């Protein structure tokens, strides 16, 4: 692995050195030219930034390697923790099942106990009533004696049932205590495992965050480096373009200089020709004194020609100066144009980037606005629904709070546990994925290590050293089975050994390279070494596999030992909790025994009082017989009134519930229902009925409190309801009860739906953007305003530069046109001069020929040849 890293680092360093060389070459090229001084400084800045980014990249790579090593260590710890958490979850599930069974048994026992208590209370009330009657003074009838005996028997049976139920409750409580202790022990173990997992997760998260930060820094630096390289490439391209332009301008200057030289040569030739003409004129003047007039004319013409030549030379000189000025102006214009082009390109780039940024920001702003509007609408709708739901929830909860509290608690605990289990499953799935990736990396690294070992096997001495180290390793593994506490130190030792092995591998590679150089000398030893190496390689592979197997066994033993320790701790906590629960149960049993003794005393007291009352009742039997009949009649009347009163109270309660229901339905359906008036009328009728029932109840209460029967001594007549009426009433009550149970089920379903809606509302509200999003939006708006201002400034500058460039273009075109017109004038002048020269030559030739013809020629004795000799005879 280290060799691969070294091989990766080497080409990067070589590439960096090549870039450094290129930079130095470019600097040496740019240092001679002063016009590119700014570019050279920019280039140096880019190079310094690239150097810094390269150094930061090196540092980040080293940090990434360290973080990867720590992640591997933490992943192993997480794997062990996940195994423990999975075992804990199975135990928790089994304990939950046992607890649910125990709770069911406890609930049934509690119901039985409540029924028994109710019967005891009813009996006590009857006893109190009887004692009151006895105190009023009269004897009991036979029916009453039989009733009392039946009641006493029933009480004894009830007490027996209560004792049985108490014993069952004690047993169930013991079972419950055991299961609770088991559950608490499992929960304690689960909490410890969760703590360990959370610690490992925090460490892994911390490491991952650091790695992600470093990777982001690295990516940022790589982007900057790429940007710098692209800038450098662009600057180099600009330099090349400038050099090409300079080369072209030099060629243009050389061409113009060549033209000037040719022009000079032509002027010199013309001057020489003028001198020749002057010489000829002088000779002609010397030879032709007779033709002075013609010579004077010719001299005048020559003087005129000389003046014209001087004027032409002055014009040529002026044209040369103008050309020099024009060249300078052209160079300045070219420089300005290049500067403007560069500035324009930079401005266009900035403009494009700013446009892209503005477009991106506008899109983000639009999307955020749309999202904000949608969120606002959703929030308003959800707030409305939440208000409605809150109202409904408050109304529903006020009606069924006592019955639902326990169910809610149990369901909440169940949901929390299920959510925790689901979270643990998700986290375990994530950790499994991470472990799977890490195992892949580990396998890759193992393959790389095996490849490296195969390379290293060429050296015999290193193999012997490794065999010794493997032997030591085995000893260490054997010791680790007895001393599992020192596993971490051994692990660190193995890591250091691995690092040593990697160093040894590097050294062995160096030695291999040296041995390769000596291969030409040691060819006869190579075959023997190859055979020995193959044997040693096979042995080393076996040893490597054996080592892997031993490491796996070591890890399993470590996990088992950790598991056993945790189980021991769990059992210890379980025993402690059992003892605490046992103490609680003993205290409860003692309280129950005290209650039983107290009730027994009360029963004995009641029996003694009964005996006393029996003796008193025998004496007062006659008086009580008369009173009993009256009491019976009054009691039946009272019972009827009480039943009617209870019915009215129940009707009132039902009506109240119905009113609440109607109000709730009215609140929910107020927007969609059109027949509001009908509902109001119904509500009004219901209220009237309710008021009627209330007045009726009040009248009944007043009648009970202030009976209208003045003559107490008269016998009251009454008739018990028939069995058919009672059966009908029972049927109606059963129907009512069924309907009420159905309503309760519907209410529970509604409550569940409302709870679901409430949870969804909570989640939606949690997902809604908070004040931070508004602050970010404000920041984005502020930045958008600044960017728009900058864009306006840049656009105005761009327009100014464009107008300047247009002016410069027009100036260049004008100068080019002037230059072309000057060239045309110059060529026309040259042509005129050539034509005049040709004419002068022709005229001179004609003059010479005419002078030669007109002058007399003498030959021999000096007689003229063209005159005829007149001879006289």
Swiss-Prot record:
**GO annotation terms (biological process):** cilium assembly; flagellated sperm motility; Notch signaling pathway; protein localization to motile cilium; sperm axoneme assembly; sperm flagellum assembly; sperm mitochondrial sheath assembly
Q: Which residues cross the membrane?
A: none
Q: Where in the cell is it found?
A: Cell projection, Cilium; Cell projection, Cilium, Flagellum; Cytoplasm, Cytoskeleton, Microtubule organizing center, Centrosome
In its UniProt entry, the species of origin is given as Mus musculus
Q: What is its main location?
A: other
InterPro entries (alphabetical): CFAP58_CC
Protein family (similarity comment): Belongs to the CFAP58 family.
Q: List the protein's name.
A: Cilia- and flagella-associated protein 58
Q: Could you tell me in which tissues this protein is expressed?
A: Predominantly expressed in the testis. Also found at lower levels in ciliated cells and tissues such as neural progenitor cells and oviducts.
Disruption outcome: Male mice are infertile with severely decreased sperm motility and abnormal sperm flagellar morphology.
Chain spans, region Disordered: 202-221
Q: Which UniProt keywords apply?
A: Cell projection, Cilium, Cilium biogenesis/degradation, Coiled coil, Cytoplasm, Cytoskeleton, Flagellum
Query: Taxonomically, which superkingdom?
Result: Eukaryota
């Amino acid at each position: 692995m280290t060799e691969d890293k070294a091989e990766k680092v080497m080409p990067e360093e070589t590439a960096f050195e090549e870039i450094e060389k290129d930079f130095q070459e470019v600097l040496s090229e740019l240092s001679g030219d002063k016009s590119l001084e700014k570019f050279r400084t920019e280039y140096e800045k880019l190079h310094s930034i690239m150097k810094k980014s390269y150094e930061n990249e090196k540092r980040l790579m080293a940090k990434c390697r360290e973080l990867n090593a720590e992640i591997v260590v933490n992943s192993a710890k997480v794997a062990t923790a996940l195994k423990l958490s999975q075992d804990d979850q199975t135990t928790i599930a089994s304990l939950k099942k046992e607890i649910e069974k125990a709770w069911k048994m406890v609930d049934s026992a509690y119901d039985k106990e409540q029924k028994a208590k109710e019967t005891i209370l009813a009996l006590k009330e009857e006893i109190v009533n009887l004692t009151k009657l006895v105190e009023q003074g009269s004897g009991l009838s036979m029916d009453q004696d039989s009733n009392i005996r039946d009641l006493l028997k029933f009480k004894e049976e009830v007490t027996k049932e209560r004792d049985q139920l108490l014993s069952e409750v004690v047993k169930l409580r013991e079972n419950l205590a055991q299961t609770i202790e088991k559950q608490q022990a499992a929960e304690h173990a689960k909490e410890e495992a969760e703590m360990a997992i959370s610690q490992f997760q925090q460490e892994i998260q911390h490491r991952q965050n650091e790695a992600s930060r470093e990777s982001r820094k690295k990516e940022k630096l790589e982007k900057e480096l790429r940007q710098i390289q692209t800038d450098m490439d662009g600057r180099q391209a600009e330099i090349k373009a400038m050099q090409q332009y300079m080369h072209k301008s030099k060629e243009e200057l050389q061409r113009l200089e060549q033209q000037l030289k040719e022009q000079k040569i032509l002027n010199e030739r013309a001057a020489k020709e003028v001198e020749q003409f002057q010489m000829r004129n002088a000779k002609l003047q010397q030879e032709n004194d007779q033709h002075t007039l013609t010579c004077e004319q010719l001299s005048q013409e020559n003087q005129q020609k000389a003046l014209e030549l001087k004027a032409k030379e002055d014009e040529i000189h002026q044209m040369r100066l103008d050309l020099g000025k024009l060249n300078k102006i052209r160079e300045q214009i070219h420089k300005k144009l290049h500067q403007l082009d560069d500035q324009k390109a930079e401005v266009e780039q900035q403009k494009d980037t700013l446009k892209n940024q503005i477009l991106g920001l506008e899109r983000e702003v639009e999307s955020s606005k749309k999202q904000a509007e949608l969120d606002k609408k959703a929030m308003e709708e959800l707030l409305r629904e939440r208000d409605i739901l809150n109202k409904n929830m408050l109304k529903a909860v006020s009606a069924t709070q006592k019955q639902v509290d326990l169910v809610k608690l149990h369901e909440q605990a169940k949901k929390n546990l299920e959510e925790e289990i689901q979270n643990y499953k998700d986290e375990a799935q994530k950790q499994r994925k991470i472990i799977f990736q890490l195992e892949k990396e580990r396998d890759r690294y193992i393959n790389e290590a095996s490849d490296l070992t195969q390379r290293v096997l060429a050296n015999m001495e290193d193999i012997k050293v490794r065999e010794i180290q493997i032997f030591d390793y085995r000893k260490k593994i054997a010791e680790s089975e007895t001393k599992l506490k020192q596993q971490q130190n051994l692990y660190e030792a193995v890591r250091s050994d691995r690092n040593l092995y990697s160093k040894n591998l590097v050294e062995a590679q160096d030695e291999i390279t040296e041995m390769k150089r000596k291969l030409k000398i040691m060819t006869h030893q190579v075959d023997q070494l190859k055979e020995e190496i193959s044997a040693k390689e096979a042995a080393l592979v076996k040893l490597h596999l054996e080592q892997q197997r031993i490491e796996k066994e070591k890890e399993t033993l470590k996990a088992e030992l950790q598991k056993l320790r945790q189980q021991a701790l769990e059992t210890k906590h379980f025993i402690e909790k059992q003892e605490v629960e046992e103490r609680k149960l003993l205290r409860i049993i003692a309280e129950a025994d005290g209650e039983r003794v107290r009730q027994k005393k009360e029963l004995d007291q009641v029996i003694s009082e009964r005996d006393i009352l029996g003796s008193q009742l025998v004496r007062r039997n006659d008086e009580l017989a008369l009173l009993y009949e009256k009491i019976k009649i009054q009691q039946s009347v009272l019972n009827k009134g009480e039943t009617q009163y209870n019915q009215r109270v129940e009707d009132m309660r039902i009506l109240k519930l119905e009113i609440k229901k109607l109000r709730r339905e009215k609140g929910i359906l107020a927007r969609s229902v059109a027949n509001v008036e009908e509902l109001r009328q119904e509500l009004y009728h219901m209220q009237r009925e309710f008021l009627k029932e209330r007045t009726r109840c009040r009248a009944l209460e007043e009648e009970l409190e202030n009976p209208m029967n003045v003559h107490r001594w008269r016998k009251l007549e009454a008739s018990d309801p028939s069995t058919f009426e009672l059966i009908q009433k029972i049927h109606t009550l059963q129907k009512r009860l069924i309907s009420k149970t159905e309503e309760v089920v519907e209410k529970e379903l509604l409550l569940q739906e409302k709870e679901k809606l409430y949870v969804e509302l909570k989640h939606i509200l949690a997902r809604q953007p908070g004040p931070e999003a508004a602050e970010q939006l404000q920041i984005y708006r502020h930045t958008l305003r600044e960017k728009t201002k900058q864009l306006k400034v840049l656009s105005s500058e761009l327009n100014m530069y464009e107008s300047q460039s247009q002016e410069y273009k027009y100036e260049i075109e004008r100068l080019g046109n002037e230059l072309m017109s000057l060239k045309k004038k110059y060529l026309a002048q040259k042509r005129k001069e050539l034509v005049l020269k040709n004419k002068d030559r022709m005229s001179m030739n004609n003059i010479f020929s005419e002078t030669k013809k007109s002058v007399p020629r003498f030959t021999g004795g000096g007689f003229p040849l063209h005159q005829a000799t007149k001879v006289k005879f």
